[in-house]
Amino acid sequence: MRNKAKGFPNQVNHKFEGEPGATDAYASKRPNGETNTRPQERMRASGKR
């Protein structure tokens, strides 16, 4: 039986709710297109937010 027949909520509408995704501060590329140096520090900082 499919979700529609079971009465589950439509999950497409919930896709953009909640916390936003990664911000520019934790992006892998700089605005000029270069790759950020020290990716381990960036990933560690992203996990602590």
Swiss-Prot record:
Bias type Basic and acidic residues, positions: 39-49
Inducers of expression: Expressed only in the forespore compartment of sporulating cells.
GO cellular component: endospore-forming forespore
Region (Disordered): 1-49
Superkingdom of the organism of origin: Bacteria
Cell compartment(s), UniProt: Spore core
Main localization, broad class: other
Alphabetic keyword roster: Sporulation
Stored NCBIfam families: PRK03081.1, SASP_sspK
Full protein name: Small, acid-soluble spore protein K
Organism of this sequence: Bacillus pumilus (strain SAFR-032)
